[in-house]
Curated annotation (Swiss-Prot):
InterPro entries linked: DYNC1I1/DYNC1I2 (IPR025956), Dynein_IC (IPR050687), WD40/YVTN_repeat-like_dom_sf (IPR015943), WD40_repeat_dom_sf (IPR036322), WD40_rpt (IPR001680)
Entry keyword annotation includes Cytoplasm: yes
SS bond partners: none
Residues with Phosphoserine modification: 51, 84, 91, 95, 98
Positions carrying Diphosphoserine: 51
Protein name: Cytoplasmic dynein 1 intermediate chain 2
Record's function text: Acts as one of several non-catalytic accessory components of the cytoplasmic dynein 1 complex that are thought to be involved in linking dynein to cargos and to adapter proteins that regulate dynein function. Cytoplasmic dynein 1 acts as a motor for the intracellular retrograde motility of vesicles and organelles along microtubules. The intermediate chains mediate the binding of dynein to dynactin via its 150 kDa component (p150-glued) DCTN1. Involved in membrane-transport, such as Golgi apparatus, late endosomes and lysosomes.
Entry keyword set: Acetylation, Cytoplasm, Cytoskeleton, Dynein, Microtubule, Motor protein, Phosphoprotein, Repeat, Transport, WD repeat
Similarity-based family: Belongs to the dynein intermediate chain family.
Subunit description: Homodimer. The cytoplasmic dynein 1 complex consists of two catalytic heavy chains (HCs) and a number of non-catalytic subunits presented by intermediate chains (ICs), light intermediate chains (LICs) and light chains (LCs); the composition seems to vary in respect to the IC, LIC and LC composition. The heavy chain homodimer serves as a scaffold for the probable homodimeric assembly of the respective non-catalytic subunits. The ICs and LICs bind directly to the HC dimer and the LCs assemble on the IC dimer. Interacts with DYNLT3. Interacts with DYNLT1.
Organism the protein comes from: Bos taurus
Alphabetized GO MF terms: dynein heavy chain binding; dynein light chain binding
Modification Phosphothreonine occurs at: 89
GO biological process: transport along microtubule
């Protein structure tokens, strides 16, 4: 209770102080106004008026006379403090009432005496209230008490006019002062700094994406714009041009040697190129990363090295790394996090590694256990750790029956297998091999082609039936052949091409679909469930350049081809071809049975003709 009473008394004192300040302000304002009016009156008619002191004396005498006191009475109550004014007793109130009632009547002098004042404080009833506030952008007006408290605080001395002038002059001089002109040396230092190069590389890539983005504002969702294409839709809209990638400096007059799609970022495509004979001062080897997501015409990343890049792949499980196999035999590793376009790692040119061109690089394994596998044309296969390319983890010579080494030109691993693989060779033979075990090395030889093997690929579509034993090959003998690891003779030979067939690849989603490209600039899609004599869909690239590489996207809805002039073309594959139906695996099984039966009949006929 004592704390509350002290707090209440303190609040009362503050209120009284504020009231005194207000009264003082009002009194000063009234005096100022009165002085102004008096000056005006004196200007019109100067009249000698009584002074303020005389007027106040007369008012005091009139007030004393109204209360029954004479001017000579020495009894004058002392001035009361603000605190005593706020607390009044019943006796004082009664005396005031009696005094008021006697106004106008003449009475004798009143005897004044001393009275004991008893002060009683009654604490106010505590009222608990709850308030809910809502934030708004409008600034609330300050309370009167806060304004008065601010008035009580002594204000800071204002800045002298001279100081203000000097400050303004300084500001004007700063604004008018020209910026510091950088010297050529300082400019070059900034341009070659690590921070500027990183910022410029990142910013230009974003600006290019924004400038190249094109949106069809005339697209009609009602479908009326599809009426003209109804015939194509009925025909399946088999192949349609999507994008073309070409760079005047980095890909002109260069041959596309390899293509690979990123598994982490499906829109990214890496392409490797060999040397440009027309530009001897440019790097011999180039690897460009193209972006399908944005309509920009420049590569996302540019990498190069001093030897022609014969093979390239994204390092699986390492989205920032790109691996390249070079003509000199070196394996190079680029990192897109680095501002350098040159390799961040490379293998040594020594007998422990490759000394011949590396046409095959592949990352196999799982997230926690994976290796980089490389094969060169001297038949040497090496296994590497991506963390250390100074020395291979293990190496092996691919030799068939203690004869000369196999000159490998292409390689493929079956789905989910990291030990067994198939390779194609320069002499036209196909070999199965394994990396580990008692029979490490070449296992079997498959003969059937009459020219060097240019491409090989194992069946990759996963479904109800396992077809991982199948693989296809392409060759200089103008044919594509279908094989199974269970038989060393080809199951079927596709002979619809009239030039070298440079590459072949199974669809990653459709069990009976594969693609091949030839030297006439033609891309063929074969759906073996529909026909085995002619391709289901074909298209020729404008200008008919030789197509060196073909690569499906992971979704199987787009396909990329690279030609001998450095251009990459992306085609959209029609839904009726690319998307398999539920019965495609069963149908493909029946197709294989028919192919095997026809091959057996042909072998029997050939056997009967030989004795005759």
């Amino acid at each position: 209770m004592s704390d509350k009473s002290e707090l209440k008394a303190e609040l009362e004192r503050k209120k009284q102080r504020l009231a005194q300040i207000r009264e003082g302000k009002k009194r000063k304002e009234e005096e100022r106004k009165k002085k102004e009016t008096d000056q005006k009156k004196e200007a019109v008619a100067p009249v000698q008026e009584e002074s303020d002191l005389e007027k106040k004396r007369r008012e005091a005498e009139a007030l004393l006379q109204s209360m029954g006191l004479t001017a000579e009475s020495p009894i004058v109550p002392p001035p009361m403090s603000p605190s005593s004014k706020s607390v009044s007793t019943p006796s004082e109130a009664g005396s005031q009432d009696s005094g008021d009632g006697a106004v106008g009547s003449r009475r004798g002098p009143i005897k004044l005496g001393m009275a004991k004042i008893t002060q009683v404080d009654f604490p106010p009833r505590e009222i608990v209230t709850y308030t809910k506030e809502t934030q708004t952008p409008v600034m609330a007006q300050p309370k009167e008490d806060e304004e008065e408290e601010d008035d009580v605080v002594t204000p800071k001395p204002p800045i002298e006019p001279e100081e203000e002038k000097t400050l303004k002059k300084d500001e004007e001089s700063d604004s008018k002062a020209p910026p510091h002109e950088l010297t050529e040396e300082e400019k070059q230092q900034i341009l070659h700094s690590e921070e500027f190069l990183s910022f410029f590389d990142h910013s230009t890539r974003i600006v290019e994406r924004a400038l190249s983005e094109q949106i069809n504002i005339f697209f009609d969702y009602s479908g009326r714009d599809l009426e003209d294409k109804e015939g194509e839709i009925q025909a399946g809209a088999k192949l349609s041009l999507n994008r073309q990638f070409f760079d005047e400096r980095w890909s002109k007059h260069r041959v596309v040697s390899c293509l690979d799609w990123s598994s982490q970022y499906p829109e990214l495509l890496v392409a490797s190129y060999n040397n440009n004979e027309d530009a001897p001062h440019e790097p011999d080897g180039v690897a460009l990363v193209w972006n399908m997501k944005y309509k920009k015409t420049t590569p996302e990343y540019v990498f190069h090295c001093q030897s022609a890049v014969m093979s390239a792949t994204f390092a699986k499980f390492h989205p920032n790394l790109v691996v390249g196999g070079t003509y000199s035999g070196q394996i190079v590793l680029w990192d897109n996090r680095s501002n350098k376009r040159t390799p961040v790692q490379r293998t040594p040119l020594s007998a422990a590694a490759h000394t011949h061109p590396v046409y095959c690089v592949n990352v196999v394994g799982t997230q926690n256990a994976h290796n980089l596998i490389s094969i060169s044309t001297d038949g040497k296969i090496c296994s590497w750790s991506l963390d250390m390319l100074s020395h291979p983890q293990d190496s092996m010579e691919l030799v068939h029956k203690q004869s000369k080494a196999v000159a490998v030109t292409s390689m493929s691993f079956p789905v989910g297998d990291v030990n067994n693989f198939v390779v194609g060779s320069e002499e036209g033979s196909v070999y199965t091999a394994c990396r580990h075990g008692s029979k490490a090395g070449i296992s079997e030889m498959f003969e059937g082609h009459q020219g060097p093997i240019t491409g090989i690929h194992c069946h990759s579509a996963v479904g109800a039936v396992d077809f991982s034993h199948l693989f296809v090959t392409s060759s200089f003998d103008w044919t594509v052949k279908l094989w199974t690891t269970k038989n060393n003779k080809p199951l079927y030979s596709f002979e619809d091409n009239s030039d070298y067939v440079y590459d072949v690849m199974w669809s990653p989603t459709h069990p009976a679909l594969f693609a091949c490209v030839d030297g006439m600039g033609r891309l063929d899609l074969w759906n073996l469930n529909n026909d085995t004599e002619v391709p289901t869909a074909s298209i020729s690239v404008e200008g008919n350049p030789a197509l060196n590489r073909v690569r499906w996207t992971h979704s199987g809805r787009e396909i990329a081809v690279g030609d001998s002039e450095g251009q990459i073309v992306i085609y959209d594959v029609g839904e009726q071809i690319a998307v398999p139906r539920n019965d495609e695996w069963a149908r493909f099984g029946r197709t294989l049975a028919e192919i095997n039966a026809n091959r057996a009949d042909a072998e029997e006929e050939a056997a009967t003709r030989i004795p005759a």
